[in-house]
Amino acid sequence: GEAVAIASDQVPELSGGEISKFFGQECLSMSLLWKLQNKTKAKVHSMVCIRGPKGNDFKLIFSPQLEMPHTIKEGVDTMNKELEKCIMLAPEQYAWEYKKYRRAGNEYHYNKRIL
């Protein structure tokens, strides 16, 4: 009866992730979820919290159990696709707290000074 919650949009250290697409753009994504599930055989679900129209009520939405693939790369791809689905339930509420695309060899778009 125990649970672990992982913020799957965090950017890992280079050794802790795989390059995967997120909204069509390559990024380094954590492999921790796949590694934990592969080791423990735990059930995996996504969860999203949607703020209600008045701003003082919230709805938690859990996905059906996710089938985790046999390889790390496929597991990371599955996690990113599921995260995209969660975000698209209310994209205006998603807070881009992490610089998701900074470690994938993409042009660096963060911390540029605006004149």
Features from the language model and the residues they span:
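Non-catalytic C-terminal accessory region of glycerolipid acyltransferases
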Residues: G1-L115
